[in-house]
Amino acid sequence: PLDTWGPNSAFERLFQTRTVAWHTAHAPSFALRADRGELQKTGEDLAPIAPALLAAFRITSDELNEIRALHLQRGATLQLDLAGLSAVARVVLLARALQLRVDQLAALGRLVAPDADPFRVADPAATQRFVALVRELMASDFTPERLAYLLRHEDAKRSQSPATAQVGALLSTI
């Protein structure tokens, strides 16, 4: 999970900022218990704090939806707890480290063998294999989208309508 210890912890740098506080009417959403091991108030879904997550991670609602879908494909639902926030952070950090968009990372994640799944719990070797595969791909003429199309017949067309989180964020600011 995200480091929660001290004023310079990853949790504090992400969620205890004015930008995040401005995007959520629920400031207690990011309050930690006294032992700092979990949020004071957990929930079943990240939707109520989606605008704050978009601000904290500097991602779009499409990217947040892609992250949710990525975890659903692995049988996990992202909940409003430290584990859910950490799961979002892992995807965002890996995508940025590999200089990929979240949708590209997700597409490549669907193409690799299970032993190279970067989101396998407690398996850094799988992440290393994934990183090596991505670097090999980036050195080629293939893009993640082309490879997904060739191997899985996935089309990278995006919906032109706004995502639910975008509509909710806009309505909450009105």
Where are these regions (language model features)?
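Hydrophobic/aromatic interaction determinants used to assemble and anchor large protein complexes
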Residues: P1-I174
